[in-house]
Amino acid sequence: MSQYTIPHVIERTPAGERSFDIFSRLLNERIVFLGTEIDDGVANVVMAQLLHLQADSSDQEIGLYINSPGGSTTAMLAIYDTMQFLRPTIATYCMGQAASAAAVLLAAGTKGHRHVLAHSRTLLHQPSTQGNGTISDLALQAAEIMRVRSQTEAILSKHTGQTVERLRRDTDRDRIFTAEEAIEYGLADTLVAA
């Protein structure tokens, strides 16, 4: 998980003042913010927040706000599976960018509740890995990356309405979508204008 200074906010009530880090304050409003590369640590935090919000209220919407360059496919799939089995509506918002694994999470929000901000971008591409080891190890890694690619294409097909064949063609190289293009492609539903 990348490290940066986390701002605090002061909440004033008749009972006094309380200081919160900004992410705790957002969580109180049922907002989960994914603003870094997705790795196992980030996935664990996001999943814990989603599970907490469902336990808090299983009938209130959860907002997943995304500004991420993507990251680990296995970490993304852990978040994806968590999103799919939760009962609340999961509204997704692309702020800045939802690239690679993060684009899958954007598309995986509840249909009709997937939003992109006006100047955001979404990027799809095929999964990649860096191989090392013996030829036998490399063959196993290649088979695994092909399995993950097929799995990711099936997930995107389910949520976008695109065929697996089209997704395979479109993700052979980086495919960048403007906010409007992401909606046309089925990655999102609504443009949030400024």
From Swiss-Prot:
A single MF term (Gene Ontology): ATPase binding
Biological processes, Gene Ontology terms: protein quality control for misfolded or incompletely synthesized proteins
Catalytic activity: Hydrolysis of proteins to small peptides in the presence of ATP and magnesium. alpha-casein is the usual test substrate. In the absence of ATP, only oligopeptides shorter than five residues are hydrolyzed (such as succinyl-Leu-Tyr-|-NHMec, and Leu-Tyr-Leu-|-Tyr-Trp, in which cleavage of the -Tyr-|-Leu- and -Tyr-|-Trp bonds also occurs)
Localization per Swiss-Prot or TrEMBL: Cytoplasm
GO cellular component: cytoplasm; endopeptidase Clp complex
CDD domains hit by this protein: S14_ClpP_2 (cd07017)
Main subcellular location: cytoplasm
InterPro entries: ClpP, ClpP/crotonase-like_dom_sf, ClpP/TepA, ClpP_His_AS, ClpP_Ser_AS
Function: Cleaves peptides in various proteins in a process that requires ATP hydrolysis. Has a chymotrypsin-like activity. Plays a major role in the degradation of misfolded proteins.
NCBIfam families attached to this UniProt entry: PRK00277.1, PRK12553.1
Assembly description: Fourteen ClpP subunits assemble into 2 heptameric rings which stack back to back to give a disk-like structure with a central cavity, resembling the structure of eukaryotic proteasomes.
Protein's name according to its UniProt entry: ATP-dependent Clp protease proteolytic subunit 4
